[in-house]
């Protein structure tokens, strides 16, 4: 039972993280993040402490053309998570920055998901994401994986209860004498 639960947890974590694009770039290079194909894309830079910024509001460091985001002259401070959405679909990127002496591996882009830093608090960003989900016509990979894990967990629980009630036979002679009422 414990090994099954561990397997399910690891599978769901792998499903959640597989949707994010991981890009490795070197210091001093330029990096372009492709946005969703829909309308105008809004980009967010997400920090580990829950704050986020709009990179397009910093024209010297970033270039936005309405869909793509280009990080100009990448520095070590540019590592982290970038989130682009057109409120119908979204893409997430995890930027890993290497020193310029280390050659960067080729860019590999997968389908993406979420991540955040600005002077606006985390609840505001959560409200923004809720609005994004409400306007979306597709279900994200993370939502599907969470639903699958919950369904499997409930199935295991129902199976365990059914097994206990059907297969456990109580010996008639063993019983608590205080609970017997032989009159």
Swiss-Prot record:
SUPFAM superfamilies: Immunoglobulin (SSF48726). Keywords: Early protein, Glycoprotein. Glycans are attached at residues 30, 73, 117, 134-135. Belongs to the adenoviridae E3_20 family. This is Early E3 20.2 kDa glycoprotein.
């Amino acid at each position: 039972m414990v090994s099954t639960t561990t397997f399910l947890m690891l599978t769901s974590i792998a499903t959640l993280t597989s949707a994010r694009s991981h890009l490795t770039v070197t210091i001093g290079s330029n990096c372009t993040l492709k946005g969703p194909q829909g309308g105008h894309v809004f980009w967010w830079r997400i920090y580990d402490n829950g704050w986020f910024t709009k990179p397009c509001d910093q024209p010297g460091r970033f270039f936005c053309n309405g869909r793509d985001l280009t990080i100009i002259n990448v520095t070590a401070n540019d590592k982290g998570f970038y989130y682009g959405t057109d409120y119908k679909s979204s893409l997430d990127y995890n930027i890993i920055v290497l020193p310029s002496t280390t050659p960067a591996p080729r860019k590999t882009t997968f389908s993406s998901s979420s991540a955040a830093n600005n002077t606006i608090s985390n609840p505001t960003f959560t409200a923004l994401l809720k609005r994004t989900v409400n306007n979306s016509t597709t279900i994200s990979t993370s939502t599907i994986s969470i639903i699958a894990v919950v369904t499997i967990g409930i199935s295991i629980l129902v199976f365990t209860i059914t097994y206990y009630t059907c297969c456990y036979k109580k010996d008639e002679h063993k019983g608590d004498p205080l609970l017997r009422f032989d009159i």
